A protein has these predicted regions:
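Bacterial N-terminal signal peptides that target proteins for export
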Residues: 1-8
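Active-site rim segments in enzyme catalytic domains, especially the processed small/beta chain
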Residues: 88-95, 101-105, 109-112, 262-267, ...
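Short, small/polar residue-rich loop motifs at catalytic or cofactor-binding pockets
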Residues: 278, 407-410, 475-477
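Internal maturation/activation junctions in enzymes
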Residues: 32, 316-428, 437, 582
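Extended C-terminal subregions enriched in glycine
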Residues: 470-472, 506, 515-562
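Noncatalytic scaffold domains of N-terminal-nucleophile
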Residues: 23-63, 67, 75-245, 250-295, ...
């Protein structure tokens, strides 16, 4: 590895950060998939910076991004360094074996860099069928069958080509240093290792994550990852093509095909032909802000645009938070009722109409049409509607319903640099530990299970999100950039992990900042709530009992669960930038 003066400075900073890892984790003054396991609550008040801010899911990753900006790098440079470190220290959630959606504001335009995985050329709509029926969900997840062509490396390279300031190789140095010299297993990673029943069946993962007796390595154990360090050195010196062609690509393909019970069809040609795509951001207005995010294949911004389009006529500001458990603010029953009913309607439309727009016509303008949303919003009454039906927006094609579960392991990064460039990036390998296949020190995704397992619904209509060769599965990832509607000034960067619950985690946070006058950290801290067109989901242990009973009286089927969001964000304030991180996970923010 080239040891430049910049690289040496970054390496020293990262080693210092590694030594202080534990202290860094504390802040300054219908078909339902269970949320990712909780790992405790750490009170967080937010982090203040004047000139720039980095927020991410792990302190070591935040330190890497911070050092890049201090060295003169852009927000995109910092995001790349953060993601590479997350591959190492938060392997259950994201990494180079997965995909990413990266939203960039350069002061002129919102660009959407699409690094979503693609289905192999040999994939068919029978991929997840067995004996004429959809296979059990985890029978599809674990093994090579679920692995799509990873997109994160290509997406990072495309973003760097357009917006980077530092040399590509320099961005790899923090992750290489940590991989070679070691990092400490965090409590969250240790807890997830202890709960996962599949990962240890992979020999490479077992050797890395588990003791000789089969028990998971404990929190506080120092891990080195020389195999990943070697991969990162190769990518640093040879560029992204080295990931998609040659020995690294061949190793991925071999791993996918070698699974003893559930091999996949990913090929060397699939990897060599993968390209990240540059798309225009999708925006909608709410109150005094313009909210911008990702278009299809993401469903997140479109669903949020529908939800808030239906809520625009409601006086949500009057429905102030109530006193919750431990005296902390919590949304009122009426606010949860209105939001959750709007979310039911949006999810019904999402499940019917949204998929990869390169393969199916997504009626975006119709779904966001104000008259259509007014009609949909008028369906919200005093009592819960239960299961919502999809509407018929203008120019909508006939489509079948698809309620494919979307699993909750993902990571979010928000960064604003000294020049005002902003990044909102959500990255994922899909389920916790992805396909449970480890190759060269990193885990491969299981993103193909985000497709519908069936190609037709019960009425015989084609499902928009069915498996097709080369197609990108629908996502709920919702990286957002929020602007003042009149001045155009950037207000916030935010997003979250959480599978399809991402939409509600981010939606709750927008309600807090846009309607209730909360700062971003306060809004993130609110108990989570929402519906995915099934039961009304409320955060266990933090939602007031009176709120639960009122919702039940309104006809809501209530489910209390951990609701482990992982929101990160950056918000403009009078002092510069407020960094915010979810108290439900291990993230922090750091700026200057």
């Amino acid at each position: 590895m080239l040891r430049t003066p910049l690289g040496l400075a970054i390496a020293l900073a990262l080693l210092a950060g590694c030594a202080a890892q534990q202290s860094l984790q504390a802040p300054p003054a219908h078909t339902l998939i269970a949320p990712e396991a909780a790992s405790g609550w750490q009170d967080k008040q937010g982090w203040q910076g004047r000139d720039f801010m980095v927020a991410a899911a792990n302190p070591l990753a935040v330190e890497a991004g911070y050092q890049m900006i201090q060295a003169g790098g852009s927000a995109v440079d910092a995001a790349i360094a953060v993601q590479l470190v997350l591959t190492l220290v938060e392997p259950q959630s994201s990494g180079i074996g997965g995909g990413s959606l990266l939203l960039v504001w350069d002061g002129q335009k919102v660009a959407a860099v699409d690094g979503r995985e693609t289905a192999p050329a040999a994939a068919t709509d029978q991929l997840f069928m067995k004996d004429g029926k959809p296979m059990a969900f985890y029978d599809g997840v674990v093994g090579g069958r679920s692995v799509g062509a990873p997109g994160t490396v290509r997406a990072l390279a495309l973003a760097h080509q357009r917006y980077g300031k530092l040399p590509w190789a320099a961005l790899f140095e923090p992750a290489i240093t940590l991989a070679e010299q070691g990092f400490v297993i965090s409590p969250r990673l240790a807890a997830l290792l202890a709960k996962d029943p599949y990962l240890a069946k992979d020999p490479d993962a077992r050797a890395y994550f588990y003791q000789a007796d089969g028990s998971p390595k404990a929190a506080g154990t120092r891990l080195t990852n020389p195999a990943l360090a070697k991969v990162l050195r190769t990518l640093a010196s040879q560029g992204p093509d080295a990931f998609y062609r040659g020995p690294l690509a061949e190793a991925m393909v071999a791993k996918v095909h070698a699974h003893p019970t559930n091999p996949g069809v990913l090929s060397a040609v699939d990897l060599a032909s993968y390209r990240a795509k540059l798309r225009d951001g999708l925006c909608f207005d709410y109150r005094q802000s313009r909210v911008c995010g990702f278009p299809a294949p993401s469903s997140g911004t479109l669903a949020l645009g529908q939800i808030f389009g239906m809520l625009e006529s409601r006086d949500m500001a009057a429905l102030k938070p109530v006193q919750g458990e431990q005296g902390q603010p919590a949304a009122s029953a009426e606010a949860i009722h209105l939001y959750s009913e709007a979310a039911r309607l949006a999810f019904a439309d999402r499940n019917q109409y949204v998929a990869d727009s390169d393969y199916v016509a997504v009626p975006v303008s119709g779904l966001l049409d104000k008259h259509y949303l007014a009609r949909r919003g008028a369906l919200i009454g005093e009592r819960s509607m239960g299961l919502a039906k999809a509407g018929t927006p203008p120019l909508a094609p006939a489509r079948g319903q698809d309620a494919t579960p979307e699993l909750p392991s993902t990571s979010h990064i928000s960064i604003v640099d000294k020049a005002g460039m902003a990044v909102s990036m959500t990255s994922s390998i899909e389920d916790g530990f992805g396909s449970r296949l480890m190759v060269n020190g990193y885990l491969l995704n299981n993103q193909l299970t985000d497709f519908s397992f069936t190609s037709l619904d019960t009425a015989g209509l084609p499902v928009a999100n069915r498996v097709e060769p080369g197609k990108r599965p629908r996502s709920s990832m919702s990286p957002l950039l929020v602007f003042d509607k009149d001045s155009g000034e950037l207000e916030m960067s935010l997003g979250s992990p959480g599978g399809s619950a991402i939409i509600n985690y981010v939606g709750k946070t927008l309600l807090g900042t846009q309607d209730w006058g909360l700062n971003l950290q306060q809004a993130i801290n609110l108990p989570n709530f929402g519906s995915r067109n099934g039961p009304t989901e409320l955060e266990a242990g933090r939602t007031p009992a009176a709120v639960v009973e009122t919702l039940k009286a309104k006809g809501h089927e209530v489910v209390l669960s951990e609701q482990t969001s992982g929101l990160q964000g950056v918000q403009r304030n009078a002092g510069g930038w407020l960094g915010a991180a979810d108290p439900r996970r291990e993230g922090i923010a750091k700026g200057q």
